[in-house]
């Protein structure tokens, strides 16, 4: 009797271990989305505070490291803990009391089936009681699939922009539109590049400066900040 029970137990365990989607079944093509953050509203936070970010499905752990960033950049390494469909992010220590920061996940973030998020996800946080609300947006036109907009605080000359890491980064969406949200009311310098990354010298690739030396959000939000990048021709702004 014990031998029969042992055989039955082995069969049950084997069946449990072999559970999988049937051959030819539907393939998961649904991008992961942001579900919630805890705390829900990230105002009046404290340095090094833990923020739990939950997604709609399990993530691929290896994709997180190169897809998460905090803006404006302050050079501090981001600390986080992976928990399946959640990420615990430990906020940076050296924070400005009046600044609104952004945790951003770009489209390099993948679910466990290697499906990327559809567009960048931005999560604002601040030590203040309210977020900055200024915005800069526009389009990048050209014969390419996507591009990246680099934004610096202050009035920088072109040589400095090509040799300095930006404070903020935004990628264009499927409509070639970019948006910077939660900006302070101040002056900015901006540059559009076809490719940007830690191992890419964007100054040697295709890029375009905006026709105005400096942008200012002190009086209003800015839209129609447009660029044109062409692979074969010289680069111009609109």
Each language-model region and where it sits:
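Coil residues (strongly favoring Ser/Thr
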Residues: 133, 233-234
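Structured interaction patches on ligand/partner-binding surfaces of diverse proteins
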Residues: 116-119, 195-233
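Acidic, low-complexity Ser/Thr/Gly/Pro-rich repeat segments typical of extracellular/periplasmic
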Residues: 17-175, 179-182, 187-191, 205-209, ...
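A generic secondary-structure signal for well-formed alpha-helical elements
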Residues: 12-15, 196
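Sec-dependent N-terminal signal peptides
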Residues: 4-13
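A generic hydrophobic-helix recognition signal that picks specific residues
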Residues: 8, 191-192
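Conserved small/polar residues in nucleotide/adenosyl-binding loops
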Residues: 236-238
């Amino acid at each position: 009797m014990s031998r029969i029970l042992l055989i039955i137990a082995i069969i049950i365990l084997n069946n449990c271990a072999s559970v999988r989607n049937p051959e030819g079944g539907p393939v998961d093509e649904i991008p992961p989305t942001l579900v919630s953050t805890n705390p829900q509203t990230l105002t009046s936070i404290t340095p090094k505070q833990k923020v739990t970010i939950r997604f709609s499905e399990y993530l691929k752990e290896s994709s997180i490291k190169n897809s998460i960033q905090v803006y404006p950049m302050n050079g501090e390494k981001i600390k986080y803990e992976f928990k399946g469909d959640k990420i615990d992010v430990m906020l940076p220590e050296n924070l400005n009391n009046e600044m609104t920061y952004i945790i951003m996940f770009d489209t390099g973030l993948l679910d466990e089936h290697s499906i990327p998020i559809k567009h960048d996800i931005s999560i604002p946080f601040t030590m203040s009681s309210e977020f900055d609300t200024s915005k800069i947006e526009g389009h990048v036109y050209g014969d390419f699939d996507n591009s990246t907009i680099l934004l610096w605080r202050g009035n920088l000359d072109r040589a400095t922009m090509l040799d300095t890491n930006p404070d903020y980064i935004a990628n264009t969406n499927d409509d070639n539109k970019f948006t910077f949200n939660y900006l302070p009311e101040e002056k900015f310098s901006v540059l559009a590049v076809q490719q940007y990354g830690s191992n890419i010298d964007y100054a040697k690739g295709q890029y375009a400066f905006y026709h105005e030396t400096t942008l200012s959000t002190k009086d209003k939000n800015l839209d129609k900040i447009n660029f044109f990048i062409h692979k074969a021709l010289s680069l111009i702004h609109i």
